[in-house]
Curated annotation (Swiss-Prot):
Details of cofactor binding: Binds 1 zinc ion per subunit. The zinc ion is important for the structural integrity of the protein.
Family: Belongs to the MsrB Met sulfoxide reductase family.
GO biological process: protein repair; response to oxidative stress
Residues annotated as domain MsrB: 10-132
Coiled-coil stretches: none
Assigned keywords, A-Z: Metal-binding, Oxidoreductase, Zinc
Originating organism: Methanosarcina barkeri (strain Fusaro / DSM 804)
Name used for this protein in its record: Peptide methionine sulfoxide reductase MsrB
Upper taxonomic lineage: Archaea, Methanobacteriati, Methanobacteriota, Stenosarchaea group, Methanomicrobia
Length: 142
């Protein structure tokens, strides 16, 4: 289940995000391909929204797409993201945004592997990563 909505003013977002995160997450920017640290990440764990911390993707669904951005064939739960039509730059794409805070994550395409056939192409700067061990420690504190 998605967590309670996070609402902040743009000034508040600017205070808590780096300039690059703000550009991508709040202004729908795109990082350069192959530039993000999570593109190369092979550890087991969970990818969370860099703005609000909501869990979005599992390392179990990450795959090598060759595009230069972290790619996943599925989300942890369909209520974690919202899909929006994006016709910017004279293209027809589907934008992926965090359902909790509305931040831009990337786009989803219909050219991914089985079992979904989807490729969630996500900006590395839009994500944080928690290893399986960090996730277990968080559960123990609850």
């Amino acid at each position: 289940m998605a967590q309670k909505a996070v609402e902040k003013s743009e000034e508040e977002w600017k205070k808590v995000l780096t300039p690059e995160q703000y550009h991508v997450l709040r202004q729908k920017g795109t990082e350069r391909p192959f530039s993000g640290n999570l593109y190369y990440n092979k550890e087991k764990g969970v990818y969370t929204c860099a703005a609000c911390g909501q869990e979005l993707f599992s390392s179990d669904t990450k795959f090598e797409s060759g595009t230069g951005w972290p790619s996943f064939y599925d989300v942890i739960s369909s209520d974690r993201v919202r899909l929006k039509e994006d016709t910017s730059y004279f293209m027809n794409r589907i934008e992926v945004v965090c359902s909790r805070c509305g931040s831009h994550l990337g786009h989803v395409f219909e050219d991914g592997p089985a079992p979904t056939g989807k490729r969630y192409c996500i900006n590395s700067v839009s994500l944080n990563f928690k290893t399986e061990e960090e996730g277990k420690q968080g559960e123990e504190r609850m």
